[in-house]
Design a protein with these regions (language model features):
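N-terminal secretory signal peptides
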Residues: 1-23, 34-38
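Intrinsic disorder/low-complexity segments enriched in polar/small residues
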Residues: 14, 45-46
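N-terminal export signals
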Residues: 21, 25-45, 219
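Structured, non-membrane catalytic/scaffold regions adjacent to prosthetic-group chemistry
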Residues: 46-310
Length: 310
């Protein structure tokens, strides 16, 4: 596999999302100026502890409008269409428990409020690239997965981390589609989980993460296609066996385990060379590893025989 050297994101002004759809220009110009405070008043009012913005990860594109992000959603437990946001409001967000188990020294249950209180929360503006060739930029609030793993202490034999989504038949009508291999399960290697970009998300736009976006807690690895990001997580399991994830079980030729973004490797039914920005409809070139190669390319240098791209 040919590994390239990557530069930080950059786009000409003409390709930036119109100001009406994003945060104001002062906020946009503040990106890159250091660690910036998210609005503590807004966060506290919304039930989310205040979090500082980490500007190490510069997205190179303007933030997508909150309205677009919260009303255009893939969440098959609520339906196989994009307009599930209203139906998802029926999913209870409190109480919520995440079980961390498997090959760890300290398996335990975490209440969501416990995680909000004890984990090192920060805001990160990340890109998200869907395998369906659309994309968005979101200010997520959360914590590095590595912080959680440090508490449970993985055994040396652990090789993979598996994420399982809640199954709540009373509020998730999509679960009646019995041909799908519920529950929704995804996974990554322990090395990928320990990477600094791997992020457990509990908020967006300075507010608690809404249910249609995977609230109260989801996972995000911005260099991978979006289907790798488990939503509404109830179990995190460490294992020595590579998991077969939800979409891989359904169609392994189209959706692989690694699912790293690569514009040069098409999906069997469409090109991945470009992506449509949510909200504006603008088409822009897709970047290898979604533009995060400088942080993750070295994870794959010895895996040339693996199908690293979905």
């Amino acid at each position: 596999m040919h590994i390239l050297k990557f530069r930080r994101f950059s786009l000409p002004e003409s390709q930036v999302t119109p100001e009406a759809l994003v945060f104001n220009r002062r906020q946009a110009m503040a990106v890159g100026a250091g660690m910036l405070a998210a609005s503590p008043a807004l966060a506290q009012q919304a039930g989310l502890p205040p979090a500082m913005r980490n500007t190490r990860y510069v997205p190179g594109r303007a933030i997508t409008a909150e309205r677009e992000v919260t009303t255009y959603n893939n969440f098959y437990e609520f339906g196989s269409h994009k307009t599930i946001s209203a139906a998802a409001q029926r999913m209870p967000q409190r109480p919520w428990t995440v079980r961390v188990e498997g090959m760890v020294e300290n398996p335990r249950n975490y209440g969501i409020e416990d995680l909000l209180a004890r984990m090192p929360l920060e805001e990160r503006v990340y890109r998200l690239r869907c395998v369906e060739a659309w994309a968005m930029v979101v200010p997520w609030t959360g914590f590095p997965l590595s912080a959680l793993l440090a508490e449970v202490k993985p055994l040396s034999s652990a090789r993979y981390v598996v994420f399982q989504t809640a199954t709540l038949p009373s509020v998730m009508p999509g679960l009646r589609q019995s041909w799908y291999p519920w529950p929704y399960t995804e996974g990554c290697t322990i090395a990928e989980a320990a990477n600094e970009l791997s992020f457990m998300v509990v908020g967006a736009y300075g507010k608690l993460l809404p249910p249609q976006n995977g609230g109260p807690i989801r996972f995000h690895q911005p260099w991978k296609y979006g289907f790798k990001a488990g939503k509404s997580i109830v179990t995190i399991r460490l294992t020595d066996q590579r998991p077969v994830s939800f979409w891989e079980k359904i169609q392994s030729q189209e959706y692989g385990f690694w699912a790293n973004v690569n514009p040069a490797v098409p999906h069997p039914r469409w090109s991945q060379a470009q992506e449509r920005m949510l909200g504006t409809g603008e088409t822009v070139p897709t970047l290898l590893f979604n533009g995060y190669g400088e942080f993750v390319a070295d994870l794959y240098t010895n895996l040339q025989r693996e199908r690293l791209w979905a």
